[in-house]
Amino acid sequence: MKKVTAMLFSMAVGLNAVSMAAKAKASEEQETDVLLIGGGIMSATLGTYLRELEPEWSMTMVERLEGVAQESSNGWNNAGTGHSALMELNYTPQNADGSISIEKAVAINEAFQISRQFWAHQVERGVLRTPRSFINTVPHMSFVWGEDNVNFLRARYAALQQSSLFRGMRYSEDHAQIKEWAPLVMEGRDPQQKVAATRTEIGTDVNYGEITRQLIASLQKKSNFSLQLSSEVRALKRNDDNTWTVTVADLKNGTAQNIRAKFVFIGAGGAALKLLQESGIPEAKDYAGFPVGGQFLVSENPDVVNHHLAKVYGKASVGAPPMSVPHIDTRVLDGKRVVLFGPFATFSTKFLKNGSLWDLMSSTTTSNVMPMMHVGLDNFDLVKYLVSQVMLSEEDRFEALKEYYPQAKKEDWRLWQAGQRVQIIKRDAEKGGVLRLGTEVVSDQQGTIAALLGASPGASTAAPIMLDLLEKVFGDRVSSPQWQATLKAIVPSYGRKLNGDVAATERELQYTSEVLGLKYDKPQAADSTPKPQFKPQPVQKEVADIAL
């Protein structure tokens, strides 16, 4: 009994010592101009902008894991697509009269051109090195079957020809031509099946994890930048002078410190919502989050990998979220080509792949519980879809693969759990709450703290998203001649649209392709694909979209 008592006393003394050490360390404040929470591509991109705009500003980045780019930015945890709406059919919804709306597709493509310019500029500065290590040319294709879907794709193709951003896209309903583009997709397919495809040669596969690592490595070369790994934010408190005191725990030794920052960016992926709530700013009360995970089938068999060089996206079935459609993609990961098929939706209450099962519950508050309930009630089809995905068997996933790869063999594929995506739920005056696809910058009125919520298109538009953030929280500086000149050096098309300007579009694509080592041939005249005859479509209930 004495030994047990002594042991318990010793443990109590030890825990008390750790607590005292933490308090002592927390009293030693570190000061910084900018605190970046999260070691992913968003923080890395914002830090890189600010390094050029205000090189004298001090910056501190804190990351909970033992390395940067280990969550959603990691190449294995996302689809690696340079989202530019060349093939993603959910960005071109069909109107009731059968016509195709291209506004969202144009906006997505414009955004990706900004990312390309940003990366090209960093290559020229020596910040990013060896472009092939993070971006490669992979043709983007849309592929559909069935008469209705073929009619849709034909109409989509015709509509996109109105934009200078989509010049060079090709369309075919010929089995032989499509087989030449994507042999793996066509071999073994019923020759009588009605199919159609579009193909754009300038599509890309992007390793966002590699971009993140290289950007942060460059930031670390400056003495006024500090990276703290295995460091978790435990508290955020606004000070009287509108600076922030952020308590950060060292997960390795149990100590803590306070960081006093003039500006805080929460770029923590799925954890951003909880940290935004922790800040106490009133703007956070409008938001909730719902986590959805993704799985991919992966093949590294050379017989499969060498037979496929494209990202091939299909069309979602009726009642499924538009972005849920699987796609079969060439990827370049860890220096080698692989093929991924998916994603298949999974459910976990974690907000991060390396998160806690309590994440969903701990982010639910009296302010956002009702919007969450409204979203659940209003989107029964989405709930049904997620349940059906969670219930998929190995055989079900393989049958889905065979729709895109008829001659697939089970032994060539393994299942991989990718990252978590926290969907935005926002309070809505009419509906109570709505599920929003996309990303959203949330900041306080003073512009001292900002968070990025949401998931799609995410990393591929990190550069324009962070530009939006700069305009939102540093508006006066952005309008200054100094910042304007620097931003236009980083992004040559900053402040103007490429869409509708053929010469400007070709100039920027030529420039970024040369610097990034990507394929680009000046588009020829559009082919003679028959113009679609629009047919009225039955009005269907809109299905909320999600990012996987």
Swiss-Prot record:
The keyword Cell membrane belongs to this UniProt entry's keyword annotation:
no
Q: In which pathway does it act?
A: Carbohydrate metabolism; tricarboxylic acid cycle; oxaloacetate from (S)-malate (quinone route): step 1/1
Q: Which cofactor does it need?
A: FAD
For this protein, the record's InterPro entries field holds: FAD/NAD-bd_sf, MQO
> Could you tell me what reaction this enzyme catalyses?
(S)-malate + a quinone = a quinol + oxaloacetate
Tell me the GO BP annotations in alphabetical order. Answer: tricarboxylic acid cycle
* EC number(s) given by UniProt: 1.1.5.4
Q: What class of enzyme is it?
A: oxidoreductase
Which keywords does UniProt give here? FAD, Flavoprotein, Oxidoreductase, Tricarboxylic acid cycle
A GO molecular-function annotation: 2-hydroxyglutarate dehydrogenase activity
Q: Which family, according to UniProt?
A: Belongs to the MQO family.
Looking up NCBIfam families in the UniProt record yields: mal_quin_oxido, PRK05257.1-1, PRK05257.1-4, PRK05257.2-1, PRK05257.2-4, PRK05257.3-2, PRK13339.1
Q: What is this protein called?
A: Probable malate:quinone oxidoreductase
Which species does the entry assign this protein to? Escherichia coli (strain SE11)
